[in-house]
Regions:
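Short, acidic/polar
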Residues: 22-36, 176-184, 310-320
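N-terminal beta1-alpha1-beta2 module of alpha/beta enzyme domains
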Residues: 1-69, 167-170
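Hydrophobic faces of well-ordered beta-strands that scaffold small-molecule active sites
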Residues: 5-8, 45-47, 72-74, 101-105, ...
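Active-site mouth loops of central-metabolism enzymes
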Residues: 9, 13-27, 77-79, 167-177, ...
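Acidic (Asp/Glu)-rich catalytic clusters
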Residues: 38-39, 61-68, 90, 94-100, ...
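Conserved, mostly hydrophobic/aromatic
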Residues: 41, 63, 93, 137, ...
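An alpha-helical appendage that flanks or caps ligand/catalytic pockets
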Residues: 2-4, 9, 117, 123-165, ...
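Alpha-helix-loop-beta-strand connector modules within alpha/beta enzyme cores
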Residues: 57-73, 345-359
Length: 398
């Protein structure tokens, strides 16, 4: 299956580098952002969730209305919507978008964050509830007959759903780095999301996920989604200078209370963030170009690991993860809209997903960051032969 790319849709011009306090939705910005992702052939966009943030369903429906190809990943916390209601809402969005809906589950990694919306289950209970939730969704989409449910977390009788997904079901994504996340995602998810860790640790996590899938008796395995924050410039030297400017801005914003994480924030409770901070304590740079000071600058809040370097360096770094089994790569920078356009448009960002068969036939690939569908090792060889003539022409804003 080809490698696919994911971005994240932002509803206004506020960024981590230049935050706009209490920024409201800018409808025209949101529509322009979504159209750019569609035009530059991103495959998916994640619509995030936070207790204090905009409603992802409304934002997702807006994205669906102004795009034609982009798949819309709705981030969903089970405590926010009863599963039978979510089944209909997702299927409705799927019909409105002609089969482009995806759901990404967040079990909840912070007791304090969950409590803000009335959820007082502990972490283990939240994962148990998530397991029920996914099973209910699948049954609601597939069952031809009304059905009952009676478990610790949900109880209902004779639920009948007439709102069906376009393709019979909707892809389910799960993320996390805990044993419960591996078990539930490995056994039930279509996609499993990971944050960018060094290759060794990423391989260990993928092996855990695959082992859980096998233990559950699956004949398939979840697709692996890995997230990075690329910082790219024409040369490695320029990229590192840009990276340090980015880090200085993140640190300054946090110190002045403008960052997404206050300076006095306690250590994170979720395992994924704890893992990132532990890796950061071992050194700044891992493998080819994986950079961790952005993790400590944000207290590992969400996806925060950067890939730093020239287009060649960053593309080779991502291909290392593709070789491990990652076939969904999330890329978003720190200057949200500009970076999304640069990744999609500029030759300087040139990750290629051009079909092997067409390359072998002599067709010229589009010069496009998101053109990326070689088989794993063939990608590496053909990247250079296809793009060597134009590498010297690459340029990117620093």
């Amino acid at each position: 299956m080809p490698t696919e790319f994911i971005s994240l849709t932002f509803p206004n011009a506020s960024t981590e580098l230049n935050p706009i306090p209490n920024a409201a939705i800018d409808p025209e910005f949101l529509k322009r952002y979504a159209r750019n992702l569609d035009d530059y052939e991103y495959n998916y966009t994640l619509v995030p969730y936070d207790s204090s943030y905009f409603d992802p369903w409304t934002v997702g429906a807006t994205i669906a209305a102004v795009t034609t190809k982009l798949k819309i990943i709705i981030a969903l916390r089970p405590n926010t919507l009863f599963p039978t209601v979510a089944a209909k809402a997702l299927a409705t969005l799927d019909q409105l978008s002609s089969g482009r809906a995806v759901v990404h589950f967040i079990a909840g990694g912070s007791d304090a964050e969950q409590a803000k919306e009335g959820d007082f289950l502990n972490k283990q209970e939240r994962y148990e509830r998530l397991e029920d939730y996914i099973k209910i969704l699948r049954r609601a989409w597939e069952s031809a007959e009304p059905f009952d449910w009676d478990s610790k977390y949900y109880k209902f009788t004779q639920f009948s759903n007439r709102v069906r997904p376009v393709n019979g079901t909707i892809p389910v994504s799960v993320g996390g780095s805990s044993d419960d996340a591996y078990r539930i995602g490995g056994s039930l998810a279509d996609i499993f999301g990971l944050w960018g860790e060094p290759l060794k640790e990423t391989k260990e996590q993928i092996d855990r996920i695959y082992a859980e899938a096998e233990k559950a008796g699956r004949t398939d395995r979840p697709r692996i989604w890995v997230t990075f924050r690329p910082i790219i410039a024409e040369t490695d030297e320029l990229a590192w200078a840009k990276a340090h400017r980015t880090l200085n801005a993140l640190q300054s914003n946090r110190a002045t209370g403008q960052g997404k994480v206050p300076a006095n924030t306690p250590p994170p409770q979720n395992v994924g963030s704890q893992r990132l901070l532990e890796i950061a304590s071992r050194g700044e740079v891992h493998d080819r170009a994986l950079w961790y000071p952005t993790v400590t600058a944000t207290n590992a809040r969400g996806a925060s690991t950067a890939l730093v370097g020239s287009p060649e360096t960053v593309s080779e770094s991502i291909l290392d993860y593709v070789d491990l089994g990652a076939d969904l790569i999330s890329i978003r920078g720190y200057d949200n809209l500009s970076d999304a356009i640069d990744y999609g448009r500029n030759e300087s960002s040139y990750l290629v997903r051009y079909p092997t068969a067409q390359c072998c036939a002599g067709h010229k690939p589009r010069s496009h960051f998101l053109q990326f569908s070689f088989t794993q090792r063939q990608r590496r060889c053909q990247l250079w032969s296809l793009y060597a003539p134009s590498i010297l022409a690459f340029s990117i804003g620093s």
